[in-house]
A protein has these predicted regions:
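Protein kinase glycine-rich loop
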Residues: 47-51
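Juxta-kinase regulatory segment immediately upstream of eukaryotic protein kinase catalytic domains
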Residues: 2-43
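A glycine-centered beta->alpha junction motif in the catalytic cores
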Residues: 91, 136-150, 191-199, 312-328
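Active-site activation/catalytic loop segments of kinase-like enzymes and analogous catalytic loops
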Residues: 261-292, 308-324
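ATP/Mg2+ or Mg2+-diphosphate-binding catalytic cores
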Residues: 314-360
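A cross-family kinase active-site recognition segment
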Residues: 123, 149-206, 228, 329
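Active-site acidic catalytic loop and adjacent metal/ATP-binding pocket
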Residues: 54-81, 85-86, 119, 216-265, ...
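ATP-binding pocket architecture of kinase catalytic cores
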Residues: 61-175
Length: 360
């Protein structure tokens, strides 16, 4: 990690180019429907923008349904599915090749009967440039369901079996164009980005940097010898739907990457108390029915939690020129915000230094 004096701090200009971001922020319904209609469908004009901070996502009604060549499941699809979900990707985050890695994984999962929503295929492609502004977009089948809460033991076990099946496929090969979750990518790189951000003020710069640096001294050696496989990467309950007779449906693989298997476990059971450990045990009981779980990775939970804190701050700082981020995170960059972040890092460093790690 570089010395603080070696890091050049500037008023960050948009790293993705003003024109690309302007096109993304100004994306309008006509542009969205025009892009979708290049795939051989016709929109009715009815469209609903869905909740997404990272991308622009829309539910779109189409006339006469999908052409049969695009049906996600020709044997089981409704005769004429009329609702699509179109995702327009934030410029600069993922290349077309990186998006394609995600789509390839989703189709591998779908082809092995895992309950996921894979992108629709048109003329052998799943990701296309918007003809009016070159933003990449994809389309998906619309699926409904409910967010799960208070799952009984048997449902935790069922979810564990699903995750194990996903990891069995994930370990067959790496995602060659995606990130690997490790101290360098989620720690050092994000720390440098935050230090170069104009939103980290001089008042807190040195103390925040020291707090992050101290935490990283414990985190970095913990990843030695850890096996990386393809994982969901952001698997909390907001990214799972339950459908009657089908069970859990995994959503939003936008943060898909190479990483330890435990990354897809701890966000579902993030607590430190005995109840969280019991639930994690149920999840892993089901997991073990399909794949051997690397229990030594449970020692990474607090390290992964700390890296997520750092990554989340960097994520906001890189996007704070987007008006939607200013609305959603109005206290970002304030004294209160940085005091809280520093306190969290101090707390995590204390936990890491005493070896107070998770176990089942």
């Amino acid at each position: 990690m570089p010395n603080l004096r070696e890091i050049f701090v500037s008023n960050a200009t948009n790293a993705w180019g003003d024109q690309a971001m302007k096109s993304f922020i100004d994306l309008n319904p006509d542009q969205v429907m025009d892009a979708v209609e290049t795939l051989g469908v016709r929109c009715t004009g009815r469209m609903l923008q869905l909740n997404s901070m990272e991308n622009r996502v829309y539910e779109i009604e189409i006339e006469n349904g999908l052409p049969e060549s695009m049906w996600p499941d020709p044997e089981n699809s409704p005769a004429h599915p009329k609702l699509l979900v179109a995702k327009f990707y934030r410029p600069g985050r993922w290349s077309k090749e990186q998006i394609q890695d995600e789509h390839t994984f989703l189709h591998e999962l779908k082809d092995n009967d895992l309950n996921v929503i894979a992108p629709l295929i048109y003329q052998s492609q799943t990701v296309w440039p918007n003809p009016t502004n070159d933003l990449f977009f994809s389309v998906f089948e619309k699926r409904a369901g409910r967010t799960p809460y208070d799952l009984p033991k048997e449902e935790w076990e069922k979810l564990g079996r699903l995750l194990a099946r996903m990891h069995l496929i994930g370990e067959t090969k790496p995602a060659k164009n995606r990130l690997t979750l490790n101290p360098a990518t989620y720690g050092d790189s994000n720390i440098n980005a935050i230090l170069q951000s104009p939103y980290l003020t001089d008042k807190y710069r040195e103390v925040w940097y020291q707090a992050a640096k101290n935490a990283m001294q414990y985190i970095t050696p913990m990843f030695d010898g850890i096996k990386n496989i393809r994982v969901h990467g952001d698997l909390h309950f907001g990214n799972i739907l339950y459908r009657e007779m089908e069970g859990p449906l995994l959503l939003d693989f936008d943060d898909f990457l190479n990483g330890p298997a435990v990354q897809d476990i701890w966000l579902l059971t993030p607590g430190r108390d005995e109840n969280a450990k019991q639930i994690r045990g149920w999840l892993l009981d089901g997991y073990e029915e399909m794949r051997e779980f690397p229990y030594h990775e449970l020692q990474l939970i607090e390290a992964l939690r700390t890296l997520r804190y750092i990554h989340f701050t960097a994520w906001i700082s890189k996007r704070f020129d987007d008006p939607s981020f200013k609305i959603t995170f109005p206290h970002f960059g304030s004294d209160e915000y940085w005091s809280e972040q520093i306190g969290d890092l101090f707390e995590q460093t204390e936990i890491l230094s005493t070896g107070s790690q998770h176990s089942t």
